[in-house]
């Protein structure tokens, strides 16, 4: 059975009170999570240290920290940015890059995202590379070529070996926050295509790499996705803001793993 990763992206949401309450519920209600499930939270960067301190105080060994963004520089006169080395200093393990909202609202292109990927690997953090097509690209049948372009920009800069200990998150832009998810069968076919494409460069990396799905994941559909052969976890956005939903998604995944290993 494959490992599963569940990443909760809280985006620009929450405050000290709501985040603290969410963490209390998470750390007290999540028990006996199998080692094959990896869980991470991506709070607003301002609250990363607070989240870290809470997890430490509860002697948490289950939930890791994820950053929603990173700069391409490690230090310097770059007002408002945060470096990979700073994130590492705060015990962050994962970093999201290439998310469609960063591509759309902050005009981040493949070249910049590749530079972020490079600096994350240099700092020995784990990149979560988000790739996927928008509605127009989907309607024109360009899904595969768009995914190839986004992956190739990384390979061109740092080589295929940099995909070791990396997560790819396929997130069709048209499905994010829309309440309309892609079908599990369609997502499986795209994940299989991504894995096969990477295998053209390195079969070992292709077999080992974790490929998540992100796009209107809910408690009602999560099992339909994670039971697909090439879907190795989920990147959960709006559904994770209700901590009850996030706990249920984790428990559903956990129970599936436990049944598999019984």
UniProtKB/Swiss-Prot annotation:
Record-linked Pfam families:
TIM
Q: List the pathway annotation.
A: Carbohydrate biosynthesis; gluconeogenesis; Carbohydrate degradation; glycolysis; D-glyceraldehyde 3-phosphate from glycerone phosphate: step 1/1
An example of a GO molecular function for this protein is: triose-phosphate isomerase activity
Q: What does this protein do?
A: Involved in the gluconeogenesis. Catalyzes stereospecifically the conversion of dihydroxyacetone phosphate (DHAP) to D-glyceraldehyde-3-phosphate (G3P).
Q: What class of enzyme is it?
A: isomerase
List the catalytic activities from the record: D-glyceraldehyde 3-phosphate = dihydroxyacetone phosphate
Q: Listed GO cellular component terms?
A: cytosol
- Documented EC number(s): 5.3.1.1
PANTHER family with a match to the protein in the record:
TRIOSEPHOSPHATE ISOMERASE
Binding positions (substrate): 9-11, 177, 216
Q: Which family does it belong to?
A: Belongs to the triosephosphate isomerase family.
User: What is this protein called in UniProt?
Assistant: Triosephosphate isomerase
What the entry lists under SUPFAM superfamilies is as follows: Triosephosphate isomerase (TIM)
Q: Where in the cell is it found?
A: Cytoplasm
Q: Which GO terms describe its biological process?
A: gluconeogenesis; glyceraldehyde-3-phosphate biosynthetic process; glycerol catabolic process; glycolytic process
Q: Which UniProt keywords apply?
A: Cytoplasm, Gluconeogenesis, Glycolysis, Isomerase
Q: How does it assemble?
A: Homodimer.
CDD domains in the cross-refs: TIM (cd00311)
Q: What is its main location?
A: cytoplasm
Catalytic residue positions? 99, 171
């Amino acid at each position: 059975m494959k490992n599963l990763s569940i990443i909760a992206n809280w985006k620009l949401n929450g405050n000290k009170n709501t985040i603290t309450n969410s963490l209390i519920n998470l750390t007290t209600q999540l028990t006996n999570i199998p080692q094959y499930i990896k869980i991470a939270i991506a709070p607003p960067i301002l609250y990363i240290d607070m989240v870290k301190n809470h997890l430490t105080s509860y002697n948490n060994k289950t939930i890791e920290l994820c950053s929603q963004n990173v700069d391409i520089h490690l230090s310097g006169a770059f007002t408002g940015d945060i470096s990979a080395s700073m994130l590492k200093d705060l015990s962050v393990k994962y970093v999201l890059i290439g998310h469609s909202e960063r591509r759309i609202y902050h005009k981040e292109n493949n070249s910049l995202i590749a530079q972020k990927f490079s600096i994350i690997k240099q700092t020995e953090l784990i990149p979560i590379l988000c790739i996927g097509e928008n509605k127009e690209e989907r309607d024109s049948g360009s899904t595969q070529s768009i995914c190839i372009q986004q992956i190739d920009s990384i390979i061109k800069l740092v080589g295929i070996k940099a995909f070791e200990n990396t997560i790819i998150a396929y997130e069709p832009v048209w499905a994010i926050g829309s309440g309309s998810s892609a079908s599990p069968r369609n997502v499986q076919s795209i994940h299989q295509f991504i894995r096969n494409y990477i295998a053209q460069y390195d079969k070992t990396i292709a077999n080992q790499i974790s490929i998540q799905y992100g796009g209107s994941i809910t408690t009602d559909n999560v099992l339909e996705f994670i039971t697909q052969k090439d879907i190795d976890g989920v990147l959960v956005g709006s559904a994770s803001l209700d901590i009850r939903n996030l706990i249920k998604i984790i428990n559903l995944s956990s129970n599936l793993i436990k049944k598999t290993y019984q």
